[in-house]
C-alpha cells in the first residue's frame, strides 16, 4: 500500500507547487499585495518547480530529484528565515525596500504567507524524498 502511494509523490509535489504558484500570483496580481524581497527569492525557487515537476511526474522521471530537491530546500530555508524575521522581535532586514519582510499578512486568518510557503516547500521536499517509480 505504501509503495503504491509513493508512486504518486511526484504528482503531489507538482500539485503543491501549482497551488503555491497560484496563491502567489493571486495575491500579487488580483489582490495587489506587493511581495517583499524574500518573497521574490521564494518565487525564484517555486515557479520552476511547476514546470520541472509537471514534466517529471508525466514521464515518471525520479532522477529529477537531483534538480528539484535543492530548489525546494533553498525555498524552505528562505521561508523559515522570513518566519524568524516576523516572529523574533528585533530581527530586521535592511534590504527589504518598500515592503518590509517582517510584515505579517495572514492567509485564511491564521497562517502567515511565509509559514504557508515553508509548509509547501517542506511538503514538496518530503514528497521528493519519498518518491519512487511506479511498476
Swiss-Prot record:
Disulfide bonds join 36-39, 96-101. GO terms for molecular function: protein-disulfide reductase activity. One of its GO terms (cellular component) is plasma membrane. It holds the Pfam family DsbB. The chain crosses the membrane at residues 7-26, 41-60, 67-84, 109-131. The keyword Chaperone applies. It comes from the Bacteria. It is a multi-pass membrane protein. It is found in: Cell inner membrane. The keyword Cell inner membrane applies. One of its GO terms (biological process) is protein folding. Keywords: Cell inner membrane, Cell membrane, Chaperone, Disulfide bond, Electron transport, Membrane, Oxidoreductase, Redox-active center, Transmembrane, Transmembrane helix, Transport. HAMAP family: BdbC. Belongs to the DsbB family. BdbC subfamily. Required for disulfide bond formation in some proteins. This is Probable disulfide formation protein. It comes from Chlamydia trachomatis serovar D (strain ATCC VR-885 / DSM 19411 / UW-3/Cx).
